[in-house]
């Protein structure tokens, strides 16, 4: 496994060109935020915006629109039950992030996205959508453009591998069959791509062990994929590394790293490492 260092940030994060506009940095759609899970939608959307995605829309339960708009006026909102509008926005997106706060009763939205997806779009599957995908044994239309972000229990559901069986070799074999990138979150997060050398993070902190941290990572991965066009595995690795790097720095002075606090630091760290 290749241990990730700051070099991945300098390789992926590019200085913005003078002659560019918001469309240059990608269109991203978040789908999640069911009635009781509005916070997840706020975190994933905010982290995508702060990571630099050019245009971010979020499809969520109508009850959560006001809270998100008050917190993040930079994002556009739509009702995830308005399928006509959802299809319109989804077709225009470069990246779709689905799952944070979605709820296990919204299989219909996941299947809708899988049916709409084109070969020119990237898909990040997280949270509830990951569990639904595993439970329903769904198929990926374009696995090479798909990223899963499971924690260990979600990886068990997805792969059938018990937590104690999730060795490098076993997970790599599963990923080779799946055909997609898998960010296997743990105390030493690993990033697997089909038939390629995997990455491992030796940084991070137990201060990250708090609700919403995974939502924040999903938004960062989506935001990076929307604007940076290198090797997909490396772009995902850079977002994942930066997430843990920021947490490690903040943990020097605070017992718990709140996702909202981590998000504030994203553009500052990106500026430091732009190349």
Curated annotation (Swiss-Prot):
Pfam families the UniProt entry points to: Carb_kinase (PF01256)
Listed cofactors: Mg(2+)
Keyword Nucleotide-binding appears in the UniProt entry: yes
InterPro entries: Carbohydrate_kinase_pred_CS, CARKD, Ribokinase-like
Enzyme Commission code: 4.2.1.136
Binding sites annotated in the UniProt record for AMP: 214
Gene Ontology molecular function terms on file: ADP-dependent NAD(P)H-hydrate dehydratase activity; ATP binding; NAD(P)HX epimerase activity
First-tier enzyme category under EC: lyase
Function noted in UniProt: Catalyzes the dehydration of the S-form of NAD(P)HX at the expense of ADP, which is converted to AMP. Together with NAD(P)HX epimerase, which catalyzes the epimerization of the S- and R-forms, the enzyme allows the repair of both epimers of NAD(P)HX, a damaged form of NAD(P)H that is a result of enzymatic or heat-dependent hydration.
Record's protein name: ADP-dependent (S)-NAD(P)H-hydrate dehydratase
Biological classification of the source: Bacteria, Bacillati, Bacillota, Bacilli, Lactobacillales
């Amino acid at each position: 496994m290749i241990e990730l260092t700051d070099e991945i940030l300098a390789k992926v994060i590019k200085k913005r060109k003078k002659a560019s506009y918001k469309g240059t940095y990608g269109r991203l759609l978040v789908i999640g935020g069911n009635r009781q899970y509005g916070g997840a939608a706020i975190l994933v959307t905010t982290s995508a915006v702060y990571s630099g995605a050019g245009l971010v829309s979020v499809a969520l339960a109508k009850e959560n629109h006001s809270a998100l708009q008050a917190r993040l006026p930079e994002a556009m909102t739509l009702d995830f039950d308005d399928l006509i509008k959802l299809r319109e926005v989804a077709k225009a997106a470069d990246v779709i992030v689905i799952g944070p706060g979605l709820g296990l009763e919204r299989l219909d939205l996941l299947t809708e996205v899988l049916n709409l997806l084109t070969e020119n779009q990237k898909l990040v599957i997280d949270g509830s959508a990951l569990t639904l995908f595993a439970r329903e044994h769904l198929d990926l239309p374009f696995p090479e453009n798909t990223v899963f972000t499971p924690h260990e229990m979600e990886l068990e559901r997805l792969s059938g591998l018990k937590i104690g069986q999730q060795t490098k070799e076993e997970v790599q074999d599963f990923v080779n069959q799946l055909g997609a990138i898998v960010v296997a979150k743990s105390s030493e997060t690993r990033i697997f791509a089909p038939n390629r050398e995997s990455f491992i993070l030796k940084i991070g902190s137990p201060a990250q062990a708090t609700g919403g941290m995974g939502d924040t990572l999903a938004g960062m991965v989506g935001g990076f994929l929307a604007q940076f066009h290198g090797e997909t595995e490396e772009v995902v690795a850079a977002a994942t590394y930066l997430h843990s790097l920021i947490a490690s720095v903040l943990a020097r002075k605070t017992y718990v790293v709140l996702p909202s606090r981590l998000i504030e630091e994203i553009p500052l760290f990106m500026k430091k490492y732009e190349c």
